[in-house]
C-alpha cells in the first residue's frame, strides 16, 4: 500500500508538472501569435500610406502635365495626341484670341472715357441753356425803369416845359411811390393838374416839331448840306477802294492776306457798320486762321471771325457771302471743339451753305463746301453717328454719291476751280468702284498748282491714289 501510495503520488506530481508546462507553452504560443498579428497590422497601415502617397504624386504629375498645356478640359485630353505642328497652330489661335480680347477691352475703355466726356459736355450745355433762359425770364419779369435826367436832350424837356421848374420826387416817375401814398383828394388834384400839363406839353411838342421841320428845310438848302453830300460821296468812294483792295489782297500770297487783314482792322472803326465790310473782315479772319500754326491762334481767329460773320448776318439775311463765310468759320472752329459742338457746328454749316447756294447758285464755292460736308459726314465713325442721333432730332446723313454730285457741279461751273475738289472727285470714284474715272481725275488734279493750304495738304492723298490706281 505504501509502495502504491508513493507511486500514485509520483504520478500525480508528474501530471501536475506536465500540465504546468503545457499551460506555459500554450501561453507562449498565444503571445507569439498576438505579437505577430500586431506587427502585421502595423505594416498593413504603413503600406497603404506609401501607396497613397505614390498615387497622389502620380496624379499630381499628371495634373501638372495636363495643366502645362493651355486650353479647356477637352484640350487637355486631345492635345497630347496632336502633333507638334497641330499644337503650335492651336496655341497661335489662342494667342490671337487673347490679343483680340485685349484690344476689345482697350476699345471699350476708350468708349467709356468718350461717353463720360460727352456726358459732361451735355450737362454743361444744358446747364448753360437753363441759366440763359432764367436770365431772360428775369429780364422779362423785372424790366428796367427809366432813369431821370436833367439834360435837355432827354424826356425831362417835357416836364421842364410844362412846369417851368425842376420837378420834385412826387411829380416825377421816380416819386411815383410817394405820390401813390397820398389821399384820394390829392390824387384827384394831381390828375387834374396832370391833364393840364399834358395839354401844355403837347402844344410845346407840336411847336418844337414845326420849328425842327423849318430848320431841316433851311439846312437842306444851305451850302453846308451840299458840302456834307460831297463828303458822303467821297466816303463811299473811299470804302469801295478799301473793299476792292481787300479783295485783291485776299487772292494774293500769304503776306498779301496778312496785309489785307490789317487793312480791314485799321478801317473797322470807320466802316464797321457796313455788311459788305463785315463779311470781308470775317473772311480775313478765316485766312489768318489758316495761316497761323499755333492751335490757340487758329481757334482765336476762327472765333473772332465767326462773331464778325454773325454781326454781318444781323444786318441782312440775303447776302450769299455772309452765309458762305459764316459756314467756313463754323467748320474751322469745329476743328478745335468737342464731339458735341462739332456735330452742332455741322448742322449750322449745312444750313448756311444751303442758304448761300440758294442765293447764289452759280458760285462754285458753295457746291464745293457742300460736297466736302457730304463726304465727311459719310465717313463719320459709329460714336459720332450715335451722338448726333441722341442729341438732335434729324441725324447727319449723306453719302459718297451726294458728295460726288456736289464736287462735279463745282467743276462744271468753273473747271479747275480747286485742286482739292478734283482729289475729292477721284477719291469718290474710287470708293464707288469706278477706278478708271478715279484715275482720270487724279491726273487732272496733278495738273493744277497748290493755291490753298488744303491743296497742299492733299498732296499726300494724291500720292496714295497714284500707288493704288497706278
UniProtKB/Swiss-Prot annotation:
InterPro entries in UniProt: RMD1-3_a_helical_rpt, TPR-like_helical_dom_sf
Coiled coil: 91-125
Cytoplasmic side: 36-470
Post-translational modification: Phosphorylation at Thr-160 of the FFAT motif activates interaction with MOSPD2, VAPA and VAPB.
Sequence positions bearing Phosphoserine: 44, 46, 50, 57, 183, 193, 212, 233
Positions in the Mitochondrial intermembrane compartment: 1-12
SUPFAM superfamilies attached to this UniProt entry: TPR-like (SSF48452)
Subcellular compartments: Mitochondrion outer membrane; Cytoplasm; Nucleus; Cytoplasm, Cytoskeleton, Spindle
Ranges for region Disordered: 168-205
Quaternary state and interactors: Interacts with PTPN2. Interacts with microtubules. Interacts with VAPB. Interacts (via FFAT motif) with MOSPD2 (via MSP domain). Interacts (via phosphorylated FFAT motif) with MOSPD2, VAPA and VAPB.
Record-stated family: Belongs to the RMDN family.
Protein name (database record): Regulator of microtubule dynamics protein 3
Amino acid at each position: 500500500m505504501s509502495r502504491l501510495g508513493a507511486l500514485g503520488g509520483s504520478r500525480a506530481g508528474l501530471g501536475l508538472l506536465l500540465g504546468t508546462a503545457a499551460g506555459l507553452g500554450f501561453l507562449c504560443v498565444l503571445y507569439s501569435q498576438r505579437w505577430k498579428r500586431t506587427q502585421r497590422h502595423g505594416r498593413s497601415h504603413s503600406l497603404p500610406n506609401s501607396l497613397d502617397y505614390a498615387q497622389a504624386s502620380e496624379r499630381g504629375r499628371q495634373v501638372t502635365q495636363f495643366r502645362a498645356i493651355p486650353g479647356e478640359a477637352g484640350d487637355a485630353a486631345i492635345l497630347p495626341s496632336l502633333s507638334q505642328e497641330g499644337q503650335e497652330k492651336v496655341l497661335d489661335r489662342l494667342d490671337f484670341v487673347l490679343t483680340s480680347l485685349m484690344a476689345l477691352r482697350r476699345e471699350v475703355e476708350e468708349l467709356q472715357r468718350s461717353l463720360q466726356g460727352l456726358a459732361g459736355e451735355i450737362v454743361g450745355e444744358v446747364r448753360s441753356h437753363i441759366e440763359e433762359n432764367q436770365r431772360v425770364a428775369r429780364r422779362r419779369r423785372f424790366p428796367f425803369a427809366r432813369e431821370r435826367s436833367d439834360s435837355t436832350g432827354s424826356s425831362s424837356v417835357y416836364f421842364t416845359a410844362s412846369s417851368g421848374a425842376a420837378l420834385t420826387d412826387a411829380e416825377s416817375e421816380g416819386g411815383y411811390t410817394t405820390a401813390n401814398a397820398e389821399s384820394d383828394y390829392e390824387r384827384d388834384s394831381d390828375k387834374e393838374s396832370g391833364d393840364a400839363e399834358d395839354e401844355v406839353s403837347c402844344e410845346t411838342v407840336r411847336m418844337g416839331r414845326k420849328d425842327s421841320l423849318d430848320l431841316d428845310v433851311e439846312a437842306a438848302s444851305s451850302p453846308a448840306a451840299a458840302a456834307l453830300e460831297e463828303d458822303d460821296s467821297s466816303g463811299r468812294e473811299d470804302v469801295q477802294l478799301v473793299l476792292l483792295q481787300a479783295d485783291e489782297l485776299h487772292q494774293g500770297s500769304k503776306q498779301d492776306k496778312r496785309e489785307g487783314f490789317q487793312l480791314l482792322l485799321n478801317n473797322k472803326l470807320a466802316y464797321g457798320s457796313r455788311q459788305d465790310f463785315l463779311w470781308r473782315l470775317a473772311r480775313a479772319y478765316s485766312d489768318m486762321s489758316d495761316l497761323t500754326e499755333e492751335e490757340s491762334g487758329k481757334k482765336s481767329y476762327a472765333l473772332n471771325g465767326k462773331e464778325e460773320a454773325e454781326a454781318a448776318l444781323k444786318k441782312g439775311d440775303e447776302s450769299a457771302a455772309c452765309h458762305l463765310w459764316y459756314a467756313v468759320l463754323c467748320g474751322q472752329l469745329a476743328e478745335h471743339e468737342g464731339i458735341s459742338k462739332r456735330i452742332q457746328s455741322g448742322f449750322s454749316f449745312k444750313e448756311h451753305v444751303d442758304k448761300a447756294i440758294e442765293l447764289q447758285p452759280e458760285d462754285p464755292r458753295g457746291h464745293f463746301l457742300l460736297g466736302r460736308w457730304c463726304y465727311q459726314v459719310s465717313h463719320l465713325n459709329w460714336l459720332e453717328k450715335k451722338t448726333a442721333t441722341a442729341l438732335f432730332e434729324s441725324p447727319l446723313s449723306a453719302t459718297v454719291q451726294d458728295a460726288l454730285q456736289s464736287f462735279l457741279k463745282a467743276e462744271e461751273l468753273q473747271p479747275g476751280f480747286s485742286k482739292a475738289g478734283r482729289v475729292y472727285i477721284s477719291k469718290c470714284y474710287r470708293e464707288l468702284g469706278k477706278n478708271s474715272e478715279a484715275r482720270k481725275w487724279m491726273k487732272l488734279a496733278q495738273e493744277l498748282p497748290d493755291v490753298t493750304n488744303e491743296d497742299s495738304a492733299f498732296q499726300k492723298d494724291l500720292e496714295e491714289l497714284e500707288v493704288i490706281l497706278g
